[in-house]
Amino acid sequence: YSSAASDVYKRQVVVNPVFDKIRESGFTEYHFEPFTETLKRYGSSHEGVFEMWKQGINAGIFHPQFHGREHLNVKKWLRNLREDVGFTRQAFDLGTFGLTQDVDPNLRRNYMGAFNSALPEDMAYYDNLLREGLDLFEQLFGYRSESFIATTYTWHPNLEKSLKRYGVKYLQGMVVQKIPLDDDTTFTTKKTNYCGWKSAEGLTYVTRNCYYEPSQYKEDWVADCLNRIAIAFFWNKPVVISMHRLNVIGSLDKDNRTTNLASLGTMLHEAVKRWPDVEFMSSDELGWIIES
């Protein structure tokens, strides 16, 4: 690849928990809704958000791909809700599950890893979860997602059988993959998911190698990204940029959106200036090129 940068995709989970129904079940049943229904409860400030997403997709600004049905370890969350572990109930009452050990020392691990088990019964659950999630993704966006990135970069290789069955061809993530050995207790690591290599199931790795996360860490992200791009292009490799959406959200803090979008623009303009033949594409497009 003389010059290629993949940074116009957006990773998307497609459902959120329905907290009232879960509470009514005594925390024994999991209920969820499409994220488009959740958006409706944000009020007038979020009217038309999904329509704007569609406009962005049609204009080629971004191209959503599948990240999971939900960004949540459902089994662990429900169990801890029933057992009233730590601050889990208090967070639930506020409509969230986003706890960390910094907030709640009682948590051995947060709830964000949706695929943190290797148990056979959980693999069967994940199979159904992936089928539902990928089908709903297609209903919402009008196309099938051919790439996938596991939440928290954690999944068991057996999960790839289900991903392949339901149409996924490309696995995005880091070079290092975290692999569960039991039920969210013991993990090992695989450190060879190099871009262009294939998994045991024949899925192609599209590996992240550049990061833009100014809302989380105060660094010179423009300089860091440009340096990583230069290294990748020197070795004739594509650039896959990781950036969470929180970096450009402005509903709670407008400066967060304004400042970080300007910084992102600076980085992209400088990249085009330094490498005039650079091409921007989505992760599934990059996967197609690698395969061809």
Q: Which residues are covered by each model-predicted region?
A:
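Aromatic-lined carbohydrate-binding surfaces of glycoside hydrolases
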Residues: 13-50, 54-59, 64-83, 92-95
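Short loop/turn segments at strand-loop or loop-helix junctions that form parts
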Residues: 13-21, 66-71, 208-209, 236-249
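Short catalytic/ligand-binding loop motif for oxyanion handling, primarily in non-cytosolic enzymes
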Residues: 20-27, 72-77, 155-159, 179-182, ...
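Active-site-adjacent pocket scaffolds in enzyme catalytic domains
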Residues: 40-44, 57, 69-115, 121, ...
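Alpha-helical scaffolding segments of alpha/beta enzyme cores, especially the outer helices
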Residues: 48-52, 132-135, 158-161, 165, ...
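C-terminal domain-boundary segment and adjacent tail
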Residues: 165-188, 238-292
